[in-house]
């Protein structure tokens, strides 16, 4: 496979990750209005004023603009080169373009017209899908280079494992929205203790922001336990299928790091590094879970053909 196409895939995936984390940086630093209510200009200028909020917001917009060029190029090139090898290519190329433009549109509308916490949470959720689409498209490019298709040999995925893969993917997306809602309602430090909320009221939440925070913690705890269950099933029953075995090991690592970074956000009183790490780990986890969905689609297709 063309080395330039591989390089483009890696670069595009990296830039999409930068855009995703950059959006979290804009939110964490309160830089959403760093360029005023103007888009694409920044206070009527192409280049930003030399203050942190304007530079952060402008940099996020610039990275988003670069990502549009890269994603369009990657989608078209991969569609031309690897569609004959992988039938999923066209779907992923279209997905990456559609969700990228939805992501950009929501961001622009939020700047110009203002937005609420629910809309901004939706913006982050769409950004995750956009990133995952590009990530999987890049994986396909590398897989297409395997002359014997060693990475995509026929799989055997039982109904129990399919349930875990699909269920955890859907549920993790819901948990992502609860986390984004925590961020956009400024509820990150509503509960100063872990795992309970505070010394008051036996550690239970008493007002809206505390309920938002504890609701996210409860949802995240269930996700953590569910991934442990799925990982144990993979370790005991899928040792010979590397994509599934190592995929769940990766998920277990990412969800553990995700939980630790979330705890450190509370104890560090919203340290920026931990907050950005929290966004990074969930992006990695979601990418692996989306790849599982691709494996299921392949398995079902090959089962119908046999």
Curated annotation (Swiss-Prot):
Origin superkingdom: Bacteria
UniProt key word Zinc-finger: no
Mutation effect (residue 123 to M): Inactive. Contains heme B and heme O
Catalytic activity: Fe(II)-heme o + 2 A + H2O = Fe(II)-heme a + 2 AH2
Consequence recorded when altering residue 123 to L: Inactive. Contains heme B and heme O
Residue intervals on the Cytoplasmic side: 1-2, 79-88, 140-159, 237-242, 295-306
Extracellular topological domain: 26-51, 114-115, 186-210, 269-271
Quaternary data: Interacts with CtaB.
Function noted in UniProt: Catalyzes the conversion of heme O to heme A by two successive hydroxylations of the methyl group at C8. The first hydroxylation forms heme I, the second hydroxylation results in an unstable dihydroxymethyl group, which spontaneously dehydrates, resulting in the formyl group of heme A.
The protein, known as: Heme A synthase
Organism: Bacillus subtilis (strain 168)
């Amino acid at each position: 496979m063309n080395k330039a196409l591989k390089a483009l895939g890696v670069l595009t995936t990296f830039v999409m990750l930068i855009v995703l984390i950059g959006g979290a940086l804009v939110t964490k630093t309160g830089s959403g209005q760093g360029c005023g209510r103007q888009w694409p200009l920044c206070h009527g200028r192409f280049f930003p004023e030399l203050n942190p909020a304007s530079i952060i917001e402008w940099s996020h917009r610039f990275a988003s603009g670069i990502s549009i060029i890269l994603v369009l190029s990657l989608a078209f090139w991969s569609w031309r080169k690897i569609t004959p090898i992988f039938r999923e290519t066209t779907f992923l190329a279209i997905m990456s373009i559609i969700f990228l433009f939805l992501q950009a549109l929501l961001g622009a509308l939020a700047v110009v017209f203002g937005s609420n916490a629910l809309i901004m949470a939706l913006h982050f959720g769409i950004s995750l899908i956009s990133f995952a689409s590009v990530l999987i498209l890049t994986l396909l490019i590398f897989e297409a280079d395997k002359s014997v298709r060693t990475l995509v040999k026929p799989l055997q995925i039982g109904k129990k494992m399919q349930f875990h893969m699909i269920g955890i993917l859907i549920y993790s997306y819901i948990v992502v929205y609860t986390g984004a809602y925590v961020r956009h309602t400024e509820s990150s430090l509503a509960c100063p203790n872990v795992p309970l909320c505070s010394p008051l009221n036996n550690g239970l939440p008493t007002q809206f922001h505390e309920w938002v925070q504890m609701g996210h913690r409860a949802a995240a705890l269930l996700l953590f336990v569910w991934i442990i269950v799925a990982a144990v099933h993979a370790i005991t029953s899928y040792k010979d299928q590397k994509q599934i075995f190592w995929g769940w090991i990766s998920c277990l690592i990412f969800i553990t790091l995700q939980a630790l970074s979330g705890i450190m956000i509370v104890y560090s009183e919203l340290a920026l590094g931990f907050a950005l790490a929290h966004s990074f780990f969930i992006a990695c986890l979601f990418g692996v879970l989306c790849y599982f969905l691709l494996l299921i689609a392949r398995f079902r297709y090959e089962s119908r053909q046999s």
